[in-house]
Amino acid sequence: MKILVINCGSSSLKYQLIDMTSEQPIAQGLVERIGIEGSVLTHKVNGKKYKIEEEMKDHKKAIELVLNALVNEEYGVIKNMEEISAVGHRVVHGGEKYAESVLIDSEVMEALEDFVKLAPLHNPPNIIGINACKELMSSTPMVAVFDTAFHQTLPDYAYMYSLPYDLYEKHGIRKYGFHGTSHKYVSAMAAKVLGKNIEDLKLITCHLGNGSSLAAVKNGKCVDTSMGFTPLAGLTMGTRCGDIDPAIVTFLIKELNYSVDEVNKIMNKESGVLGISGISSDFRDILKAASEGNERAELALNIFKNKVIQYIGAYTAVMGGVDAIIFTAGVGENSEPIRKRIISDLGFLGIKLDEEKNKVMGETETISTEDSKVKVLAIPTNEELMIARDTKEIVEKNNIK
């Protein structure tokens, strides 16, 4: 069985064609600058890259070129579209309605449109991608895999805000959490690495990248997570502010005369480690500047570390202990110095870092010592494979041939 995984951004599209026998991608690629001049498709097969430069006015045209690339005589990997058993779509927001992945039908599409108000930046391109695929592959089953679904197991006292209850009832204002597909994947992988049943474990998964979030996973279920109603809450991120006093928003608007759009831009695009350091949103640049004595770069790293430690401490308390802490995503998987900074302050949990093993980049490794009371793992996330697994499971459950 071959599953096509599609992840649509506002002007980009990532894809993988995964052979479910080996669970390996047989082709993958990225389309950039959709609807903008200079659009390009980079298609990868067997370690070789092929660039297709063609005007792509919309996502439909982009997906058309992706499908053409997959069957191309020179760099294609399948003979025809019938070889694709199903398409798995990453959808950022599934609201309260979807606690798991779902076969896409007209009712699901209506619900996705309804969730646009909850994810105005992310859900529209997801919907456009689904519609484009439906037009081009009308007989192929489509599955929606939601970033929010894994967090739907949060108890009410963890997802409710202390706001008037009718704001939740009428407008769905509550914590949803994001990066769920990644947290789900690495928590399952951690159980495998530890040789234990996930139902018997208390895990803290740290998805650290330009966007970052933590999740508390107790007995295989997410019981808390750091992002909230939107992906702006929680940790200090690349350009996002994370948790701040909400009254700062009204202060900026009333006292400093910022518009709502300006405040939104500041908090989403100009804050985080970029805003503090004044250098970059890339942790590699900030680490370099800090090593050269830049005080604001060092401050940005300390604020980031402090937030991660606060959440690890809180989630250890929430779960009544922790068996393992997992680092994943761009920074979590690849940054030895960031992991070291965080782990060095977790000695109170009986954690001991193996300095040599912590040098790992992009591979699965236990980076704590043998006698560390709490295990620490670095595990590369694989959201595409998780989407493909969910898609396969749903197609088989619905007996779709």
Curated annotation (Swiss-Prot):
It catalyses: acetate + ATP = acetyl phosphate + ADP. Its EC number is 2.7.2.1. GO terms for molecular function: acetate kinase activity; ATP binding; magnesium ion binding. Pathway: Metabolic intermediate biosynthesis; acetyl-CoA biosynthesis; acetyl-CoA from acetate: step 1/2. Substrate binds at R90. It is found in: Cytoplasm. Gene3D superfamilies: 3.30.420.40. GO terms for biological process: acetate metabolic process; acetyl-CoA biosynthetic process. ATP binds at K14, H207, L208, G209, N210, G211, D282, F283, R284, G330, V331, G332, E333, N334. The record marks H179, R240 as: Transition state stabilizer. Mg(2+) binds at N7, E383. Homodimer. Catalyzes the formation of acetyl phosphate from acetate and ATP. Can also catalyze the reverse reaction. HAMAP family: Acetate_kinase. This is Acetate kinase. The lineage of its organism: Bacteria, Bacillati, Bacillota, Clostridia, Eubacteriales.
